[in-house]
C-alpha cells in the first residue's frame, strides 16, 4: 500500500461557509454534512461586506470621539476664558461697536464729509484693537487645548494605525494625501486614515457646538472683525 502523505498544516485554512463550515488543504477538501461551500465570488462579497461594516463602526466611533474632544475643548475654554470678567467685558464691547459701526456704514454716503470718514476710521481702529485683545485672552486656552488634542490624537492614532476607517468619495489633492493616506497600505488614495477623519470631524463639530451653546461670535462681529474672528473690514470705501 502506498504510504499516506501527511497534510501540509501550513496550507490548511478554515473557511466560513454559509450555513456551516469546512476545512480546505492543498491536497484535500472536506465540507461538513449539510453545508454548501461558498464560491470564491461569494467569499469576496462576504469579505467586502465585513470590511464595510467594520469601517462604518470605526467612522461612528471616530465621530463620537470628536464630539467628546470638542466638548472637552469647550469646557477647558469656559474654565479659562468664557467665565472671566475680562472676556465678558471685551466681548460686550466688540458686539456693541460692531453693530454701531455697521449701522453707520449703511447710512453714510460717498459725499460724506472728511470728519465723518475720520470718525468711522477711528471706530474701526478701536474695534480692531478690542478684537486683538479678545484674541489674546482666548490664546491661553489654545495652548491647553492643543496639548490635550495632541495627547489624545497620539493615543487614538496608535489604536487605528494602519487601518482604513472610511472611503473618501473623491481623490484628495496630492499635498493632502500625505495626511489622508497616512500609514495606510496600498495605492488606493480614496482610503481614509484616522488622523484625517478625526481632524475634519473635530473642526466641524466644534464650530457647531459653539453655535449651539451660544459661544460663537455674532454675525456683526464676524463681519466687522479682523484677525481670528473674520476678514478685515473693507475700509477702502472711506479713504
Curated annotation (Swiss-Prot):
Residues carrying Phosphoserine: 111, 239
Family annotation (Pfam families): EMC3_TMCO1
One GO biological process term: ER overload response
First-listed, main subcellular location of the protein, grouped into a coarse class: endoplasmic reticulum
Similarity annotation: Belongs to the TMCO1 family.
Parts forming coiled coils: 83-140
InterPro entries: EMC3/TMCO1, TMCO1
Cellular component, GO, one term: cytoplasm
Reaction catalyzed: Ca(2+)(in) = Ca(2+)(out)
Disorder cited: Craniofacial dysmorphism, skeletal anomalies and impaired intellectual development syndrome 1: An autosomal recessive disorder characterized by craniofacial and skeletal anomalies, associated with intellectual disability. Typical craniofacial dysmorphism include brachycephaly, highly arched bushy eyebrows, synophrys, long eyelashes, low-set ears, microdontism of primary teeth, and generalized gingival hyperplasia, whereas Sprengel deformity of scapula, fusion of spine, rib abnormities, pectus excavatum, and pes planus represent skeletal anomalies.
Tissue specificity field: Widely expressed in adult and fetal tissues, with higher levels in thymus, prostate, testis and small intestine and lower levels in brain, placenta, lung and kidney. Present in most tissues in the eye, including the trabecular meshwork and retina (at protein level).
Topological category with respect to the lipid bilayer: Multi-pass membrane protein
An annotated Gene Ontology molecular function: calcium channel activity
Cytoplasmic compartment spans: 84-137, 214-239
Lumenal side: 1-55, 158-171, 182-191
Name of the protein this chain belongs to: Calcium load-activated calcium channel
Residues annotated as transmembrane: 56-83, 138-157, 192-213
Intramembrane segments: 172-181
Subunit structure: Homodimer and homotetramer. Homodimer under resting conditions; forms homotetramers following ER calcium overload. Component of the GET- and EMC-like (GEL) complex, composed of RAB5IF/OPTI and TMCO1. The GEL complex is part of the multi-pass translocon (MPT) complex, composed of three subcomplexes, the GEL complex (composed of RAB5IF/OPTI and TMCO1), the BOS complex (composed of NCLN/Nicalin, NOMO and TMEM147) and the PAT complex (composed of WDR83OS/Asterix and CCDC47). The MPT complex associates with the SEC61 complex.
Localization terms from the record: Endoplasmic reticulum membrane; Golgi apparatus membrane; Mitochondrion membrane
Keywords assigned: Calcium, Calcium channel, Calcium transport, Coiled coil, Disease variant, Endoplasmic reticulum, Glaucoma, Golgi apparatus, Intellectual disability, Ion channel, Ion transport, Membrane, Mitochondrion, Phosphoprotein, Transmembrane, Transmembrane helix, Transport
Known function: Endoplasmic reticulum (ER) calcium-selective channel preventing intracellular Ca2(+) stores from overfilling and maintaining calcium homeostasis in the ER. In response to endoplasmic reticulum (ER) Ca2(+) overloading, assembles into a homotetramer, forming a functional calcium-selective channel facilitating Ca2(+) release. Mediates ER Ca2(+) homeostasis in osteoblasts and plays a key role in bone formation, via the CaMKII-HDAC4-RUNX2 signaling axis. Component of the multi-pass translocon (MPT) complex that mediates insertion of multi-pass membrane proteins into the lipid bilayer of membranes.
